[in-house]
From Swiss-Prot:
Compartments reported by the entry: Cytoplasm
UniProt key word Signal: no
Role noted for this protein: Involved in DNA mismatch repair in slow-growing cells. Acts as a chaperone during the assembly of the 26S proteasome, specifically of the base subcomplex of the 19S regulatory complex (RC).
Lineage start: Eukaryota, Fungi, Dikarya, Ascomycota, Saccharomycotina
Subcellular location, principal: cytoplasm
Natural source organism: Kluyveromyces lactis (strain ATCC 8585 / CBS 2359 / DSM 70799 / NBRC 1267 / NRRL Y-1140 / WM37)
The gene coding this protein: HSM3
Protein name: DNA mismatch repair protein HSM3
Length: 469
């Protein structure tokens, strides 16, 4: 009998007999680790699954760590044939558990459902319907909502599951979209955000996936949390259209909503909550719009709602987030008077992604300015600068003292962010053409080896752990 088999049997027996001791958590932690690193199960685990089910439905103990139990369950259902799982957790059992209102039991059920194989095995059952009922119930606690969202995010990658949600539950979706309850409406937004990553053009229903501008305007004026949720949803739609092949059609549906967000920004002083809580989301949304191939969208928004002129207080905020190629094409003149300082490093990092913008700004990126900067801001700028060949040429040919400071600054690395930034600068440089590095190649390689081998400028494992905590 292997150690894993023995641990499975011991855990199953303890759960079945309800004999829970403090040592059970150590047993579950060990078993979860061993199962996670394994490719197969050495024994039939229906006995363990039955014990988990029996324990969760009939008992509870403050000594038992339910998160560890879920880790064990997740590892088990990921390794055993799903038909074995269904022999223990039938569809009726899963539905009953969802209706129970019990947090631990519901999270367990979500783990089982998420492991469904084939993915659409539950599409012809009421299981997804019950999940949606529980999800949209205002009294459902956040932990269960999170578990449901995670599980639905896995299930909706399958077409039959999406059909069950979008067709069989269409009346439910329309009802919650029109409801007056902010909590329920925000959950609806989160659900369609999850769905939007997988839906096809044929499945994308405007009456479900697009929020009426009147609703957005009302939330902008009266409920800032819902308005932020709407912003996040449209940011996700724009991200999908920008990053996923074949999803460009999303733009035709979202572009009629662009103006309402421009109006929100223009009214930020009038609407206190928008100016103080939603502005960063609006800037992110405008950033996404600026990266669309058709630059007329951002150009029209700018002209109407946030014209970019030197005297505008918000100018630097937009120069920090907008596509620098758009800035280069339309507003290169705005960069003439921009001086590099620690407070606007992020703006420079964004702008120098475009070579025309870089040419306009490169005189500001000099040895004196960089060497006078705080270390982290200096490394942030260098991280951006070393991502382009023209930036590397400027650095290696025109700023020898900065190059020396990169190589010799190991002792200035005092916390993890400094370490990570410096490491990225080295990696960016060493990925460049060796001829561009010239005399700097060997010193860079030598110091990079020192970093990797822990001889200089590197933390002990304890220091790194402390920083993460």
């Amino acid at each position: 009998m292997t150690d894993v088999t023995k641990d499975i049997d011991n855990l199953a027996d303890a759960l079945l007999t309800m004999e829970i001791s403090p040592e059970i958590n150590d047993l579950m932690e060990k078993l979860a680790l061993n199962l996670t690193s394994s490719n197969n199960l050495p024994v039939d685990v229906k006995h363990l699954l039955t014990s988990i089910k029996t324990y969760l439905t009939q008992s509870s103990s403050e000594m038992l760590d339910y998160n560890l139990l879920l880790e064990v369950l997740d590892a088990v259902v990921g390794l055993c044939p799903f038909e074995d799982v269904l022999k223990v957790f039938s569809v009726d059992d899963l539905i009953t558990a969802l209706k129970s209102g019990d947090k631990a039991l519901t999270e367990t059920v979500c783990q089982v459902i998420a492991a469904a194989s084939p993915r659409d095995i539950f599409a012809g059952t009421p299981l997804l319907d019950e999940m949606l009922k529980l999800y949209f119930c205002e009294s459902t606690v956040v932990a269960i909502v999170n578990a449901l969202e995670k599980t639905l995010g896995i299930l909706v990658t399958n077409q039959l599951n999406r059909r069950r949600i979008l067709e069989n539950n269409l009346p439910v979706l329309i009802s919650v979209k029109d409801c007056k309850n902010s909590t329920t409406f925000c959950r609806f937004l989160d659900l369609i955000k999850i769905l939007s990553a997988s839906v096809t053009f044929e499945e994308f229903r405007k009456d479900i996936f697009i929020i009426d501008n009147m609703v957005t305007n009302k939330m902008m004026e009266n409920d800032i949390l819902v308005f932020i949720h709407i912003c996040q949803y449209y940011i996700e739609l724009l991200t999908i259209s920008l990053t996923e092949d074949g999803k460009e059609w999303v733009i035709r549906y979202v572009k009629p909503s662009f103006e309402i967000f421009g109006e929100a920004f223009s009214r930020r002083e009038e609407l206190f909550d928008v100016g103080h809580f939603a502005k960063s989301y609006l800037l992110t949304l405008f950033s996404k719009i600026s990266y669309l191939d058709d630059k007329s969208y951002i150009q029209l928004l700018e002209a109407q709602f946030f014209p970019l002129y030197p005297d505008k207080q918000y100018l630097d905020e937009f120069l920090t987030v907008l596509d620098p190629s758009y800035i280069a094409k339309v507003h290169l003149d705005l960069l003439k008077e921009k001086a590099l300082r620690a407070g606007n490093v992020h703006m420079f990092v964004n702008l120098i992604k475009d070579e025309d913008c870089f040419v306009q700004l490169k005189d500001e990126i000099n040895s004196k300015t960089l060497n006078d900067m705080p270390y982290i801001e200096k490394m942030l700028l260098l991280d951006g600068l070393t991502l382009t060949s023209y930036g590397i040429q400027h650095l290696t040919r025109n700023m020898p003292s900065v190059m020396n400071s990169i190589i010799d600054s190991g002792n200035q690395v005092t916390e993890k962010l400094s370490f990570d930034l410096r490491l990225r600068v080295f990696e960016n440089l060493l990925e460049a053409n060796p001829q561009e590095l010239s005399v700097w190649l060997i010193p860079l390689q030598s110091e990079y080896a020192n970093i990797l081998n822990g001889r200089r400028g590197r933390f002990s494992s304890g220091q790194l752990a402390d920083d993460y905590l």
